Amino acid sequence: MSLLCRNKGCGQHFDPNTNLPDSCCHHPGVPIFHDALKGWSCCRKRTVDFSEFLNIKGCTMGPHCAEKLPEAPQPEGPATSSSLQEQKPLNVIPKSAETLRRERPKSELPLKLLPLNISQALEMALEQKELDQEPGAGLDSLIRTGSSCQNPGCDAVYQGPESDATPCTYHPGAPRFHEGMKSWSCCGIQTLDFGAFLAQPGCRVGRHDWGKQLPASCRHDWHQTDSLVVVTVYGQIPLPAFNWVKASQTELHVHIVFDGNRVFQAQMKLWGVINVEQSSVFLMPSRVEISLVKADPGSWAQLEHPDALAKKARAGVVLEMDEEESDDSDDDLSWTEEEEEEEAMGE
């Protein structure tokens, strides 16, 4: 008769007749989850990946046990500072917007790159991805020689890495066509000839775009402890070579490239203040976790500052109005001669 072992970290089936004192390799301790790290109280190994945590090999040998283990009793006696920090509930009242405004740094500090930590599981996934690629595929497949810059108004052609050193002069706006006139929304030069319209020099200088990256609508959320905020972006196989996360004490800028050249980008003004030097990023096969250490312990009412959320909401309304105007075209906003005559007769 085969029974299921209930020891933590084992989960194997065993025969009671052959159950020896050293048949089971398990964890006698309890799971610990603290500051995005996961592990067992009985051994020192820690990981940020939950699947790696489940696969941590047991640290103690003993017999298999088919009975469900009782819940571990709470330790008696004085608790250590670390255990208090782990068990301390988030019972701090969120600070008001006025308090946050007074305490926020007055000057905008420059953004700093946060260190990237690559999990072992992601390293293995990237190695397997490289093995599965056809010969000649890889980074060179993302940018091919002879590729044209995709920015409107720029006619540069990719010849190699040195092409990135040349400036890109382009139009950041959208083309407009109204009553035979052609122009760009970012500059006011109008022309009748389509060839002259295409030949208009760009009005902004930036970096070349050799291949449009697909914007990824990734699911993302956040959670917090008393001393930490963790922003999680979900996506398959983040590519470390193309990823960066920058932060200041009050801002967070995220640029994550996943497999398939899909890109997640976000800019946030944070609710509270963080310690940039102690913050970091963890890359895993199915997600990216951004761990932000709070400058002061306490609870955040939300991830982003209310002023930033209000500004985004207003920008969303403006964008929606712009899209409606572009759908209706500019003709709806102009008067024809017949309409002017009808208006005059009506008066």
UniProtKB/Swiss-Prot annotation:
This is Integrin beta-1-binding protein 2. Interacts with beta-1 integrin subunit. This interaction is regulated by divalent cations, and it occurs only in absence of calcium. Zn(2+) 2 binds at H27, C42, C43, C59. A motif (SH3-binding) lies at residues 28-31, 70-78, 172-175. Zn(2+) 1 binds at C5, C10, C24, H64. A motif (SH2-binding) lies at residues 158-161, 234-237. InterPro entries: CHORD_dom (IPR007051), CHRD1 (IPR039790), CS_dom (IPR007052), HSP20-like_chaperone (IPR008978). GO terms for biological process: centrosome duplication; muscle organ development; signal transduction. The keyword Zinc applies. Zn(2+) 3 binds at C149, C154, C168, H208. Residues 319-347 are annotated as: Disordered.
